[in-house]
Regions:
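Metal-coordinating catalytic core of metallo-dependent amide/deamination hydrolases
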Residues: 23-26, 121-132
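C-terminal recognition in membrane/secretory proteostasis and scaffolding
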Residues: 93, 130-137
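His/Asp/Glu-enriched, well-ordered alpha-helical/loop segment
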Residues: 1-89, 109
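Extracytoplasmic and endomembrane cell-envelope/extracellular-matrix remodeling and assembly machinery
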Residues: 1-3, 117-122, 135-137
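Glutamate identity and glutamate-enriched acidic tracts
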Residues: 18, 27, 74, 95, ...
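C-terminal cap of metal-dependent C-N hydrolases
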Residues: 67, 79-123
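Short, surface-exposed, polar/charged, turn-prone segments marking secondary-structure boundaries
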Residues: 14, 46-51, 114-118, 130-133
């Protein structure tokens, strides 16, 4: 039967396991890989279930995918001389309530500003004239 415990069973049997998304929305759904990994950590605490340790779950979304596609010597972990994209979180990256604080891609800091963050800043504490005309009173 297909259960979430299967990935824990495969890991226990010595299989290199990785968690990833395979579809046309990879960029938008990348966060789901972290959520699945976090779920597997929680599953390990359920009696009778087989999940992953935190370290194994994190490796399943970082170094193991790189190893599986033959790029483990170049990417997937932070080592001198390797290419790397780095994300700094405000908490546990496998926890849904954690948020990204900083991102570097190929060593270049990335802006985290989006349309949503600009709107939040604009309307959280609106200045004179910031609200659309419909909101004038």
């Amino acid at each position: 039967a297909a259960t979430q415990s299967n990935i824990g069973r495969m890991k226990a049997a010595g299989v290199n396991v990785a968690i990833g998304m395979i579809d046309d929305n990879d960029e938008r759904q990348a966060q789901l890989s972290m959520q699945y990994a976090g779920n597997l950590v929680a599953l390990g605490k359920v009696p009778g279930a087989t999940g992953l340790s935190w370290n194994d779950a994190f490796a399943a979304i970082t170094s193991k995918p790189a190893d599986i596609v033959g790029m483990g010597a170049e990417i997937g972990s932070l080592r001198v001389g390797r290419r790397g994209d780095v994300v700094i979180w405000d908490g546990d990256p496998l926890e849904l309530t954690s948020a990204v604080e900083k991102v570097w891609i190929d060593g270049v800091a990335q802006s985290l500003e989006t349309r949503q963050t600009r709107l939040r800043a604009r309307y959280t504490t609106p200045q004179e004239g910031a609200l659309p005309k419909a909101f004038d009173r």
